[in-house]
Amino acid sequence: LGLRHGDMLFASYQDKQEEASTSQSSAPVSEDAVDVYWSQQRGLIPRQHDRQFCRHGEKGMCDYCMPIEPYDMTYHAQHGIKHLSFHAYLRQQNIGVPSASTSYVPPLEELSYRVKVPCPSGQHESWPASICTKCQPSAITLQRQKYRMVDHVEFVHSALIDRMLDAWRKTATQRFGYLLGHYEPYDKVPMGIKAVVEAIHEPPQAGETDGIVLGMPWDDEARIQELAEWCGLCVVGMIYTDLEVADPTHSDPTQAGLVSCKRHADSFFLSGQEALFAAQQQSQHKNACRWSQSSLFNSKFVTCVLSGNPMGEIDVSAYQVSEQVMAMVDADMIEASVHPTTIRVKPSDSTRYVPDVFYRYTNKYGID
């Protein structure tokens, strides 16, 4: 180049324009119609004029009659509502319309109890060779989830249940089916959501007197989902029977037509094995959410159980497991035990890291 000692060199450069971000968080999210509806509503709970405390005319308003927020704890306690609806929870967390800034980050993030591979610090080999505080999951404190994704389950016709009961009455074996339907606003809970079931599809199964054997995944799943979409439906949950006649000998006339009550406060409502299966199904049917960094958050998938109530009558009970259970099942941290009321935490090994798990609750005296 003919350079000599002391020569000065000058360099120039041009700024490269950054390409538009195409991350999943900035892409449009196809939410359920009910989520779009509630995101466009204020959700305030109206109150009537209080003759005892209000000191104004019918067209006035004061602190005693002004609308209250959908997450008001006093209103929920007075109406016996134990959990917030999902959209009321979003309002409580002050999650509103996203900013127009390109640097906007959705506030919700899915729980994950897996070890981060590779480590964000990049200072050591990935798990299981080594681990640090930046890539290992924190200790887990189990607690009741404040909100629920679905507040009510409704069947459009009793014949949907009768068909499953007829199979049990004829064969004395349990049955399983997927619930096909849609979601609608539920007016009994502030900003509530209900699952409306319009059909039940029973996949290939082998029924037993005390359980069901399923082939997972079922072969015609894609076809059934496609047919459901053509009808404006989707898979909203699952249902199965857990029935046993109260008098197997049929010798007591007073027990005729009654079934045993297996699930109650002194036994269990959903066994550990059923809770794990529900978590797996919920993880396979996650909820599309614009407020989540991954565009997915929790699940609206419900689990319905046909079993006997304390009166000996057949009743439908609906359940959902929390996001914590879904994350623990995804991380392969828990397993069912021989006791239906207990779930066992797996030990750590060379391929599984399990952090400390604690349980936190408030007793009847309000002590944490």
Where are the language model's segments positioned?
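N-terminal beta-strand/alpha-helix entry module and adjacent surface
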Residues: 7, 13-237, 241-351, 368
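Extended low-complexity, compositionally biased segments
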Residues: 360-368
